[in-house]
Amino acid sequence: MEYRTNNVPVGNETKSAALNALPKIKISDSPNRHHNLVDAFMQSPSYSTQPKSAVEPLGLSFSPGYISPSSQSPHHGPVRSPSSRKPLPASPSRTRDHSLRVPVSGHSYSADEKPRERRKVIGNYVLGKTIGAGSMGKVKVAHHLKTGEQFAIKIVTRLHPDITKAKAAASAEATKAAQSEKNKEIRTVREAALSTLLRHPYICEARDVYITNSHYYMVFEFVDGGQMLDYIISHGKLKEKQARKFVRQIGSALSYLHQNSVVHRDLKIENILISKTGDIKIIDFGLSNLYRRQSRLRTFCGSLYFAAPELLNAQPYIGPEVDVWSFGIVLYVLVCGKVPFDDQNMSALHAKIKKGTVEYPSYLSSDCKGLLSRMLVTDPLKRATLEEVLNHPWMIRNYEGPPASFAPERSPITLPLDPEIIREMNGFDFGPPEKIVRELTKVISSEAYQSLAKTGFYSGPNSADKKKSFFEFRIRHAAHDIENPILPSLSMNTDIYDAFHPLISIYYLVSERRVYEKGGNWNRIAKTPVSSVPSSPVQPTSYNRTLPPMPEVVAYKGDEESPRVSRNTSLARRKPLPDTESHSPSPSATSSIKKNPSSIFRRFSSRRKQNKSSTSTLQISAPLETSQSPPTPRTKPSHKPPVSYKNKLVTQSAIGRSTSVREGRYAGISSQMDSLNMDSTGPSASNMANAPPSVRNNRVLNPRGASLGHGRMSTSTTNRQKQILNETMGNPVDKNSTSPSKSTDKLDPIKPVFLKGLFSVSTTSTKSTESIQRDLIRVMGMLDIEYKEIKGGYACLYKPQGIRTPTKSTSVHTRRKPSYGSNSTTDSYGSVPDTVPLDDNGESPASNLAFEIYIVKVPILSLRGVSFHRISGNSWQYKTLASRILNELKL
């Protein structure tokens, strides 16, 4: 359901009737906690002082800072009141908006009624092209209306309680589906709450969160370097020196998360992006949760290739040890170019992971092998802690010490607690503010906390205590295992600033965010106790920063029955979006990569091995729209220019489990291309694929013109905003642009690439653009890749005949069906039965790969390069296919 602007005035009678129609259920008394998310939010103190708009059939409310529907702009959706907030500065490095807003949602158009505009505006953000689609939702590129800055907006569909009730009453199968959707929404709320609190140089930063009656909109910073996966595609493997830089940054981010009682639980190559500066950014906290050292988490989730053995064995876990295993898999992939455990048969793959036997290539250094052998240990009690990993000799080689966690300086929390901070500690299932105060006071008053607070013990990342030898950590770890064979060493609380308690961690994070918003230095914000009540009243903000509260339950339970794990090879809990479809492979289609079916990080051919790689490779390309366009009275342009190359943003993995997309099925390529919203008047991709080579070779790329943003921009604010809108929404800005259906002898201008270390030898060439283009068309035809011409390259669709054949196993621990109806399974801080089937990253044989290939120009060197961008589909099939294309291109 697309977001549309509501321009219809609403009377008081309509408001009253609609509001009275909402169910009024107290959170503590409701057996169905999910149904109270919207009601509880509307009844919150910060919301009740504002007028309420009419509630549409799916429920509707709007928060402070947004004017009434009758006075909204007809083209720009919800408009912020001029007096509600200070203008956003041009550079967002200092101030950002962390509040969760509920802007006015659009009304549903009748069959005869058509919208005036296709522009979609959420707050101050103009939504543009879809650059990633998955089972969780989609990611769109967006521009800020005032500053023109680019952002990534993650859009997650939500369900209304009435719809959920209707499904639950239909059948037992529908009840399971409804329960799955409830759990999904609660995880989304938790992700939104976490994303707005975390602030680390190697974690993708969230700027805003909006909710409507049908969607969550999470606004993230724009990461313009592409996926780490594309880095691996170009290089095959990295030198240890180069891998060490990335690994230290990943370790720094994990250290920050773990110190704040957060476990990621879905760390993998697809969830690591690379910025233009060459630094990594970790994304996707959809499966993250808070952990407590004395409790156990019982949600078995993640991606199979990166999942720890205890998850496959359905064993409760604390949290950080799961991230350490995934961290080890990521390190292995970086230095070896493939995963350590792989098999075509699903049961055999499970057995390999549980056994944990790893083969190390001979070219790895002894230190690197030693580190991997400590991380990839099947027994979590014997596995290295993150502290040990960060102090390993391989990790600190050529550096002064272990990577810093960038955790700010903190002081012990003292009573009384700040009520403003307490009110913002929502979204984590802590309960109402009264309960949070009661529980937090109990923790602060405990003997353990007071004892550590008095001693002033602090083992910060830069302190002398942390700079000890690797062998000291090994000895201490082993001794503790002997003394406490049941609990690993990370279960001891020896630092009140290092994951002492989830309530403590979130209190710190909220306090630090508040200081940061006021202009403080976030790395030095806690020199005074953070809990003292301010002497002067806090100035009220003009927006609602209250997240929808999580359901009220008794938390901190860790002895419940473990949930089952799905036998499905994807996250079946995610319902496919209505605008995300796929089609079965054609019987005539042949898979040219079937020879290497399960190779997900295969080494490249011997020809590529002989080539020397340059420093690094990043992937950039124009985004591809995946949502179906609503009917519009306007005539569609003959083509849609992609946004600027700077718009290359959070990849498809940013919107959920990157390879767990359960898509529908199509009849053919035309439907697929329509669903990807690639409008063109030229011949269809299927026709071109079947056309004679002479015809295909005559197809040329479209002129890019001014749509890429490389031309001179007008100094007028009006013209500037108009250009931003045209660029974002794909409207043509150059009337003289050549139609895609035209074939000319002159090649179109090629997108220049300025990212550091973008390409390797295997992805660049001194060949002319025409030659590379002809080779691309030849290779795509040879590999049965259906393609359609877009600006600067091709939008491609590959229908594999079978990459992986999942087989059922009789093993007790083999991916059992999740028990959606059970209420006895919970994480220590997840009241939801947070049962998430493990994603094995192996889509069904009928799953399709949607991706883009661009011909780009490498500046200064007068070289041409090929850039890939995955839209949807299995990451590892994509990696194998991209490697095959590069091999056949013979650049």
From Swiss-Prot:
Keyword match Phosphoprotein: yes
Segments forming domain Protein kinase: 125-395
Pfam family name, one: KA1
Listed name of the protein: Protein kinase kin1
Gene name of this polypeptide: kin1
GO biological process: cell growth mode switching, monopolar to bipolar; establishment or maintenance of actin cytoskeleton polarity; establishment or maintenance of cell polarity; mitotic cytokinesis, division site positioning; plasma membrane organization; positive regulation of mitotic cytokinesis, division site positioning
SUPFAM superfamilies, alphabetized: KA1-like (SSF103243), Protein kinase-like (PK-like) (SSF56112)
Cellular component, GO, one term: cell tip
Naturally occurring in which organism (per UniProt): Schizosaccharomyces pombe (strain 972 / ATCC 24843) (Fission yeast)
Catalytic reactions on record: L-seryl-[protein] + ATP = O-phospho-L-seryl-[protein] + ADP + H(+); L-threonyl-[protein] + ATP = O-phospho-L-threonyl-[protein] + ADP + H(+)
